[in-house]
């Protein structure tokens, strides 16, 4: 029986010269492992099949991800699964990103908004870039902000504003200049990878995370997400969401947590499963 360590050693030894198709087959085998399937089914129920298929699709489409430890990809995906967030990079809720030979979980600002809305405590929440000429007044003490979008002078972004209002009436507004965001970036982000990819999305996430973690109501899953972000922030930080400036009003969702997977469900992968013991998995 192959051990998790022997699998990883073999993969790392050959990975540089392994064709993409063969690397995909390796990930396919890991995802077909009964132990891995069982863990995802315990978290996602009947949606586990679709989620693990999305892991394989992401892995096969990202050459940089194929250079990382495959088990770290699965471990990062499990974090997203426990938060019930999709890992499709086009959606921008959660990311699995490569850094230093390993994959890491990262949360997009849309992911923060989604987790906030699930609490049922937020009446509205939003985060937008402020362009040159739009900001008329900002008082950081009273949080009075005046924005006139009709007075935009150019497409140059001068800052970022985040706002939320709870159903009990408590509200919070934060505005950071671009210089403040840049200072925060230099202090906490050890990699420019995400910032080079989409500076505005990273800035929006930074400001929104700051206001939610300090003033917002955090559910257990939101606290978990913040912890995961803090643990990886010094290594890499990335989002790549499409720009969205509309105010989002929450409707408490009822997520069905009673669904359990059928034992007769068809394995979505035709690769040979890798035999892994439960105690060899990279997650609890």
Curated annotation (Swiss-Prot):
Annotated region described as Disordered, given as residue ranges: 236-284
Q: What is this protein called?
A: Uncharacterized protein YqaK
Q: Which cysteines are joined by disulfide bonds?
A: none
User: Where does this protein have compositionally biased stretches of type Basic and acidic residues?
Assistant: 252-262, 269-284
GO MF annotations, alphabetized: DNA binding
Q: Which gene encodes it?
A: yqaK
Enumerate the NCBIfam families for this protein.
rect
GO BP term (any one): DNA metabolic process
Q: Which InterPro entries match?
A: RecT_fam, ssDNA_annealing_RecT
């Amino acid at each position: 029986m192959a051990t998790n360590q022997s699998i990883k050693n073999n993969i790392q030894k050959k990975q540089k010269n392994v064709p993409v198709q063969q690397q995909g087959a390796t990930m396919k085998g890991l995802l077909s492992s009964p132990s891995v399937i069982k863990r995802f089914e315990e978290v996602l129920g009947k949606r586990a099949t679709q989620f693990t298929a999305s892991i394989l699709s992401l892995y096969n489409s990202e050459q940089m991800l194929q250079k990382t430890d495959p088990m770290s990809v699965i471990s990062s995906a499990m974090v997203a699964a426990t938060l019930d967030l999709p890992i499709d990079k086009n959606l921008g809720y959660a990311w699995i990103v490569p850094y230093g030979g390993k994959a890491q979980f990262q949360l997009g600002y849309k992911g923060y908004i989604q987790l906030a809305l699930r609490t049922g405590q937020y009446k509205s929440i939003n985060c937008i870039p402020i362009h040159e000429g739009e900001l008329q007044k900002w008082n950081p003490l009273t949080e009075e902000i005046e924005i006139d979008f009709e007075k935009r002078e150019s497409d140059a972004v001068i800052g970022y504003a985040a706002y939320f209002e709870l159903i009990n009436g408590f509200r919070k507004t934060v505005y950071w200049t671009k210089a403040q965001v840049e200072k925060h970036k230099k202090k906490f982000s050890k990699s420019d990878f995400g910032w080079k990819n989409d500076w505005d999305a990273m800035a929006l996430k930074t400001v929104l995370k700051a206001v939610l973690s300090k003033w917002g109501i955090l559910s257990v899953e939101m606290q978990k997400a913040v912890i995961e972000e803090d643990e990886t922030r010094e290594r890499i930080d990335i989002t790549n969401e499409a720009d969205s400036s509309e105010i989002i009003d929450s409707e408490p969702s009822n997520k069905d947590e009673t669904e359990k997977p059928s034992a007769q469900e068809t394995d979505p992968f035709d690769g040979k499963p890798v035999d892994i013991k439960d105690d060899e998995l990279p997650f609890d």
